[in-house]
Structure formats: C-alpha cells, structure tokens
C-alpha cells in the first residue's frame, strides 16, 4: 500500500508517517537544483563521461530524479548513460508523483513517463528504463540500511536526502551512512540539505 500523504495549502506534500515536508519552502525543483545538482557539481562534472551513476537516499516524490533527468536532457555534454539509484522504504502512490510535478513544464512530461512505470513496487529491486535505455532508474524498496548493504552499487554522485534527522533518524544513522559510503569511490561527491551536527559527525566517521 502507498504511504499516506497530506497536501498543505501551499501545495507542498507532507508525510503523515514522519511528520515532515517532502521538500523545503523554496520548492522541490529549486532545492534539487541548488542543493543536489549544484552541490555535486552537476551537470559540469559529468561532461563527456560515458556514464554517470547517482545514488540517492530517499526517493520520495521522485523530484530529484526528475530534475536530474531534465538536466541530462538539456545538456549537450551529457553522458551517454545516466543511472540513478535510489532507496525508499515507503513509496508514495503514482498519482502523488504526478501531483508533485504538476504545473512544472520541465518536470511534468517526465513525471508522466515515470508514472507509467511506477507500479507493483513490492520490497526488492526494480529497474525502470527511459530514453531508449539511456536513462535507468533503479529503485530498491525497503529499509535503506539493508538495501544499501545488499547492493553492489558504485556512485559518482550521492544525494543524501530524506526527512529531517529528528523525524527519520534511521536513514541518517551511522550504519546507514557507512553502507552508503561503501558505494562511493575516490572522487565521489556528496550533497545534502541538512547541516545537523550528528550527520556531519557520522559522515566524518565514514571517511
């Protein structure tokens, strides 16, 4: 069953389970661009690469994926393949994905393509294919720590996302971050919106 969502008066989706917004007041696209894309040096970092692999903790409404896909489409120097890997314990309904992107001309057409494949997400790993196989979305449904430990992923960029640490401490825990760090290589760049001291300390322990 899809996770329950409330929609606030300003149009922001709100998780009843975690008691937190899905994105900041500046808007999902602005947050995705300013925090995650720019924070990871994208799109400049992937220029001319054969492929680029992005790992995200917390798929949520899928807006970071959609914003990254839109940036890939708009970039003449884009990599031949974009592989976006994300973990999500509580997937939302496909209709909520569409609503979250509604009214955004850059994201709405891509959200409709995502909506068409976003079904049957039982616990486990699911592969969604777009752009004739040039954009891949791998969704690992289940506990983030467990899923990250089980996958043999390698990431060039990491979007460290999720609800606030006080609302969802598990996804920011040291074991989860250590499992995430296993997917990184020298040169992997990480971006996150949180400045919580506990998260900074845990990341420092991950090296």
Briefly describe each language-model feature range.
Residues 98-151:
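S-adenosyl-L-methionine
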Residues 61-66:
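Glycine-rich SAM-binding Motif I of class I
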Residues 79-82, 184-188:
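A short helix->loop->beta-strand "cap" motif at the edges of active sites that frequently abuts
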Residues 89, 172, 195:
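Short beta->alpha hinge that forms the Motif I/post-I loop of the SAM-binding pocket
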Residues 105, 109-111, 197-207:
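Conserved Class I S-adenosyl-L-methionine
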Residues 170-187:
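A short glycine-rich, Lys/Arg-flanked "PGG" loop and its adjoining helix->strand segment in the class I
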Residues 137-139, 153-162:
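Short SAM/SAH-binding signature in class I
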Residues 1-53, 69-109:
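Rossmann-like AdoMet
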């Amino acid at each position: 069953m899809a996770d329950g969502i409330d929609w606030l008066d300003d149009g922001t989706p709100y998780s009843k389970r975690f008691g937190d917004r899905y994105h900041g007041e500046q808007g999902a696209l602005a947050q995705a661009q300013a925090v995650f894309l720019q924070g990871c040096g994208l799109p400049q970092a992937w220029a001319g690469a054969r492929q680029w692999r992005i790992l995200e903790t917390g798929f949520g409404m899928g807006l970071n994926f959609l914003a990254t896909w839109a940036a890939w489409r708009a970039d003449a120097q884009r990599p031949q393949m974009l592989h976006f890997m994300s973990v999500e314990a509580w997937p939302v309904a496909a209709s909520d994905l569409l609503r979250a992107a509604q009214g955004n001309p850059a994201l709405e057409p891509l959200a409709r393509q995502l909506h068409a494949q976003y079904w049957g997400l039982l616990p486990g790993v699911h592969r969604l294919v777009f752009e004739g196989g040039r954009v891949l979305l791998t969704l690992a449904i289940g506990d983030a720590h467990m899923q990250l430990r089980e996958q043999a992923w390698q990431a060039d960029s990491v979007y460290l996302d999720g609800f606030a640490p006080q609302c969802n401490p598990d996804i920011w825990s040291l074991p989860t971050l250590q499992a995430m760090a296993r997917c990184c290589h020298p040169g992997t760049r990480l971006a996150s919106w949180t400045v919580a001291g506990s998260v900074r300390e845990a990341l420092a322990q991950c090296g």
